[in-house]
Amino acid sequence: MLARLLVGLIKLYQWTLSPLLGQRCRFYPTCSQYAVEAIQKHGAWRGAFFTICRLSKCHPWHDGGHDPVP
């Protein structure tokens, strides 16, 4: 239930705000898509943990690149 809510909120962000902000993520998949995949694969709590770890790497001093959900 919580996982579905989180995925729904992320998808809402992807459909509404993300197009206005433009492509900024230095990773593939994007951080929001990574969050969706992590939550769907690992559940709400563990997926959120993986997402927080990923977001902590999303800054100008990190090279980025391909970073799939474990």
UniProtKB/Swiss-Prot annotation:
GO cellular component: plasma membrane
Subcellular location: Cell inner membrane
SMART domains documented for this protein: Haemolytic
Leader peptide range in chain numbering: none
InterPro entries (UniProt xref): Membr_insert_effic_factor_YidD
Membrane-topology descriptor: Peripheral membrane protein
Main location (coarse class): membrane
UniProt keyword list: Cell inner membrane, Cell membrane, Membrane
Pfam families assigned: YidD
Keyword Methyltransferase: no
Similarity annotation: Belongs to the UPF0161 family.
Functional summary from the UniProt entry: Could be involved in insertion of integral membrane proteins into the membrane.
Full protein name: Putative membrane protein insertion efficiency factor
Organism: Methylobacillus flagellatus (strain ATCC 51484 / DSM 6875 / VKM B-1610 / KT)
